[in-house]
């Protein structure tokens, strides 16, 4: 049985949270950029061009690709032959999310109790999806889930 300290999980999750908000997956920028030539609509080409410009600007300035860094969603494949020492897995993940979002100066937008609407100021708790898999390793992936616009006004339908 392999032992993995919870501090290693915390450190890894912190790095993943920052990276997920600052860098696109490999090849994604090129995919969007390549779509510009194939797109028929001038408006769509313009929007895709703006997205590529935003990606480049964010990389140059070292800031998040989107201002809505959202809720941290963590996917974990935990080997059945792993023993986590120290803190509980969920606590280690949430500590990593807090470190990543606070140290990375990412937008803190999670509320503890939705009815009170009080911000936790560290973007926890995260949504954590776990799978127990064969082996003695832990594989972690972070995916920020943006929230979109919070001040929504729905107009009444037009009557004919």
Language-model regions: role of each:
Residues 39-63, 120:
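Translation machinery proteins
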Residues 64-67, 75, 131, 141-145:
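Short beta-strand segments
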């Amino acid at each position: 049985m392999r032992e993995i300290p919870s501090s290693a999980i915390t450190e890894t999750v912190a790095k993943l949270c920052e990276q997920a908000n600052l860098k696109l997956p490999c090849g994604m920028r090129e995919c969007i950029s390549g779509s510009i030539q194939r797109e028929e609509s001038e408006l769509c080409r313009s929007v895709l061009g703006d997205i590529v410009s935003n990606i480049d600007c964010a990389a140059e300035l070292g800031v998040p690709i989107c201002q809505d860094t959202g809720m941290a969603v963590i996917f974990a494949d935990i080997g059945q032959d792993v023993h986590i020492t120290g803190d509980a897995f969920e606590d280690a993940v949430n500590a990593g999310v807090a470190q990543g979002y606070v140290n990375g100066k990412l937008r803190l937008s999670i509320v503890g109790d939705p009815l009170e609407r009080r911000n936790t100021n560290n973007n926890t708790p995260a949504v954590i999806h776990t799978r127990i898999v064969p082996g003695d390793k832990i594989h972690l992936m972070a995916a920020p889930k943006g929230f979109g616009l919070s001040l929504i006004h729905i107009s009444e339908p037009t009557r004919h």
